[in-house]
Regions:
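Structured catalytic-domain cores with a bias toward divalent-metal coordination
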Residues: 2-417
């Protein structure tokens, strides 16, 4: 039973090189989705080991894509690059340095450059229809997605362009200000929901009108329109409703994007997801359940079945992290203090091993009297003096299928501009 460091020590697999992952890769081999988490958005070790896992799943188990907690339109340039598609940039570094929306460090870092260049090299050996993709799945950067829809239609279908432009003119008074739009809607009760939905339905229902577009380009067009549509709802609900409504709106968008990618890659496709533990660890086994919040981990288990999904968390006892002191503030390297007592991090730190992972099984799950522990959760905004508030009450072996632990972690290596 999952109860103490002494019991847990019998289950650990030390991280001593790529071969340490053998058991995990075999466990993940036949899953439809493998979700890889992180306890922060700015930790080197989380990115490094997610990279190692992703490479092996792709090279050895034929996984088809990686979907990350990032913007769809801007990160699609990286997808073009790793697939060597028309319009691709000259290097992953060049593309990632063009990212502009805060927090840029989440993807504009050396760790992602290394993964992207490996993907490019791996894909160069494959036919075009088997190349592995890299996609953003988040709901943000909607004005860029709106521009991409219009720019693509302008050169492919003048009638469609005119129709979509008329629909999107609903946003014209707000000129790129989504919060301004949401506040205006809250006051006037007039919104653009019908307009954005009309665009999605027009593109989805008229595939024959876009016959000159490849499946990849059509997917790009449709998915950008979905971003605009779901972002409209997300911002509107953020102002008008309680927090769980907008949170769940964003979650359903990300989950929907992952499902769309599974459909894009066809029967027997398999995907990898990179996102915060808050998104990939099953919300049913955290305090999120009490507020009605869901997440991707929960929805994928419900949709695909527990046996077809692997949820892998990442966490640490202490270390350094890249984060911002407030939303939009310049990033800085911060110190994460030692984990609080009654946390899984405090428990795992008692084990005399610098880094390791555990794979949970039915013997670890106590359905009658589950043990609730804190689980570190550092966001892009972080205040180390309030670190004790950054722990999510969690039933660990039920929230995750596996958990990686590091005694001390270091900050992401951000690209220099």
């Amino acid at each position: 039973m999952f109860s103490s460091a002494q019991n847990l020590e019998q289950k650990i697999i030390p991280l001593e090189g790529d071969a340490s992952l053998d058991k995990l890769i075999l466990t993940a081999a036949n899953k439809e989705l493998v979700l890889l988490g992180e306890a922060s958005h700015g930790t080197h070790e989380y990115y490094l080991w997610r990279d190692k896992i992703s490479r092996r799943l792709i090279a050895e188990q034929d996984f088809n894509f990686i979907a990350v907690e990032g913007d769809f339109a801007s990160l699609y340039h990286l997808n073009r690059y790793v697939k060597n598609m028309d319009g691709a940039g000259n290097s992953a570094r060049e593309i990632l340095l063009k990212l502009h929306r805060w927090p840029t460090w989440m993807w504009a870092n050396e760790e992602v450059v290394a993964l992207a260049e490996w993907l490019r090299s791996h894909n160069d050996k494959l036919p075009q229809d088997r190349k592995v993709g890299f996609y953003g799945m988040d709901v943000y950067d909607e004005w860029n997605s709106k521009k991409e829809v219009l720019d693509l239609l302008k050169v492919t279908d003048k009638a469609a362009y005119k129709y979509v432009e008329e629909q999107y003119n609903c946003f014209y008074p707000h000129k790129g200000d989504s919060w301004g739009y949401a506040n205006a809607v809250d006051t006037s009760k007039k919104n653009c929901a019908n307009a954005t939905r009309n665009v999605v339905e027009y593109i989805r229902d008229n595939r024959e009108n876009f016959s000159t577009l490849s499946d990849d380009t059509y997917f790009y067009l449709l998915q950008n329109s979905i971003v605009v549509d779901n972002a409209e709802e997300f911002y509107r609900e953020s102002v008008a409703s309680v927090g769980r409504v907008s949170w769940n709106s964003r979650v359903h968008h990300m989950h929907g994007t992952v499902n769309d990618l599974l459909n894009l890659y066809g029967e027997k496709s398999k995907g990898i997801v990179w996102a915060h533990n808050t998104h990939i660890g099953d919300a049913e086994y955290t305090s999120m359940r009490n507020t009605g919040e869901v997440n991707i981990g929960q929805l994928t288990r419900e949709g695909l079945g527990n046996n077809n999904v692997l949820l892998i968390g990442f966490t640490s006892f202490e270390g350094n992290v890249m984060a911002g002191p407030s939303w939009g503030a310049p990033m800085k390297e911060m110190t994460i203090p030692p984990a609080v007592t009654n946390s899984i991090e405090h428990e795992l730190n008692q084990i005399d091993q610098e880094s390791f992972y555990l794979i949970f099984d039915e013997k670890d799950k106590d359905y009658e009297n589950p043990k609730v522990m804190g689980n570190r959760a550092v966001g892009v905004v972080y205040n180390p003096t309030r670190d004790e508030r950054q722990f999510e009450p969690t039933i660990v072996p039920m929230r995750y299928d596996a958990l990686f632990f590091f005694k001390k972690t270091t900050a992401l290596r951000v690209l220099k501009r």
